[in-house]
Structures are given as C-alpha cells and as structure tokens.
Curated annotation (Swiss-Prot):
InterPro entries: Class_I_gatase-like (IPR029062). SUPFAM superfamilies: Class I glutamine amidotransferase-like (SSF52317). Keywords: Mitochondrion, Transit peptide. GO terms for cellular component: mitochondrion. Belongs to the GATD3 family. It is found in: Mitochondrion. Residues 1-8 form a transit peptide. This is Glutamine amidotransferase-like class 1 domain-containing protein 3, mitochondrial.
C-alpha cells in the first residue's frame, strides 16, 4: 500500500474500533455540551425511493444543530420493503437491505434501534420523509388508508403525544400521524396538483379519509397543530427548488424546538 493511501485511510479512522470511531461521528448531529432540546430523529433507510429522503434528513440536522439541540438518531431494525436502484428507478430483484443498517449511512454510524427509544429521554421527535416512511415505517405506499404502521413507530408516536412532547414530520411522513393520532391536523402542502407542482396532492384525500384534518400550506411554511403539538411541512411533496424545501424544514424545526420549551 502506498504511503499517501495509508495516510488517507489512517485519517479516515477505518481501522479503529467502532466504539471510538463513532464517537467522533456523533458531532455530525449533536452539539457538544448542549443544554438545549433533546431531539430524537427517526430514519427509514437511506435514499428517497426506498428509505429516508437524504436532503430532508440533512436539513433537519442542520437546523437542529443551529437551534442548539442534542440529537440522537433511531431506525427500526427491520428489512426494507424492497431495494430500488436509484439510477434506474427500478426495484432490484436480488437485493435485500436492513432499515437500521441503511439509516446508519446518514447517521455516520451513530444509530440506535428504534425499540430502545423512550419518550422520557427526549423533549421532541422528528420524522424526515422519503418513501421509506410509506414503505418501511408503514405500508402506506401499498395499502393507503388501510395501511399498518410499524409497531415501534406507532408506539413512539403515541408515547410522545401522550407526554405532550412535540412531534415534527415532513413530506409524506405526516400520514403516520394521521393514521396513529385521531383527529390530528397536518399539512402535506396543497390539495390540487397545480400543473405538477404538487404531484402528490391526492395524499390529502387519504389524510382526511383517516379522520385527520389537512391544512393547506406552501413549501416554505410549517403548520402547527397546537392541541396535539404536531408540526408538519410539505418538503418534497412539492416539486420545487431545494433551498425552499430547506427553508420549510427550518420553519418546522424552529416550531418543534419552541414547543419543546427548550
């Protein structure tokens, strides 16, 4: 092995034990010596078509860091519904992947099984979007309003809600709250496609069919259900520029932190 390559690998710390390697990785999503809100972020894999929407997750982490939050990331230890070749946009017939392992890519290795998440240890919880929310955290992508929500996802949503702690959701993930929390008021954006700007506008009909309320919001806005302490924003439910989605997620994060009282 050449000296430059050996040096690069050493700097990347690939040969260090995992427990020491991941300690440094934690700084990607946690503020050192932080006295702010303790926020759990729940991932659903890695990649928009079969897991977490990576831009949304990154935006959430940036805004949480800016807000002084201490972040811990979680994902369920389950198999993905399927694996999508993101270059071809097609399912891979020969691959299977684990949601927890794939989510670790975004978390830089510092990830915890969702089964270990306790609402008593956190002040708020946030769910990024991506099709993983509809495929791995629930069966919404297949079953619509008749979907089932992963038992651990359902548990933590109910636990945070019962404890009066804020819940943030973006993109398609508000359907999880609509299914689990009766009468919750959420947004996934607009209720008409508007020439393709809102390609998933039909989701609003399913939300209302579940007994939840839908409030129209633009992509840069967040909607706050004060009664249930649920904060939502459309994110990539809108076909628009990335910085606008980033701004909307920022609004959601700020409202979540405000509701946490930290």
């Amino acid at each position: 092995m050449s000296s430059p390559l050996r040096t690069m690998i050493s700097r990347l710390s690939l040969f260090r034990p995992a427990h020491t390697r991941y300690a440094a990785a934690a700084h990607f999503h946690a503020t050192s010596n932080c006295s702010g809100a303790r926020v759990a972020v729940v991932l659903s894999g890695c990649g928009v078509f079969d897991g977490t929407e990576i831009h949304e997750a990154s935006a959430i982490l940036v805004h949480l860091s800016r807000g002084g939050a201490e972040v811990q990331m979680f994902a369920p230890d389950v198999s993905q519904m399927h694996v999508i070749d993101h270059g071809k946009g097609q399912p891979s017939e020969t691959e299977s992947r684990n949601v927890l392992s794939e989510s670790a890519r975004i978390a830089r290795g510092n990830i915890t099984d969702l089964a270990k998440l306790s609402a008593s240890n956190h002040d708020a919880i946030i769910f990024p979007g991506g099709f993983g929310a509809a495929k791995n955290l629930s069966t919404f992508a297949i079953d619509g309003m008749d979907c089932e929500v992963n038992k651990e996802v359902e548990r933590v949503l109910k636990d945070f809600h019962k404890a009066g702690k804020p819940i943030g959701l973006c993109c398609i993930s508000p359907v999880l709250a609509a299914k689990v929390l009766p009468g919750v008021d959420v947004t996934v954006g607009h209720e008409e496609e508007q020439g393709g700007k809102w390609p998933y506008a039909g989701t609003t009909q399913t939300i209302t069919a579940l007994g939840a309320k839908h409030t129209v919001k633009d992509v840069t806005e967040a909607h706050v259900d004060q009664k249930n302490k649920v904060v939502t924003t459309p994110a990539f439910m809108c076909d628009t520029k990335l910085h606008l989605i980033f701004d909307g997620i920022g609004a959601m994060v700020r409202d979540v932190l405000k509701l946490s009282g930290k």
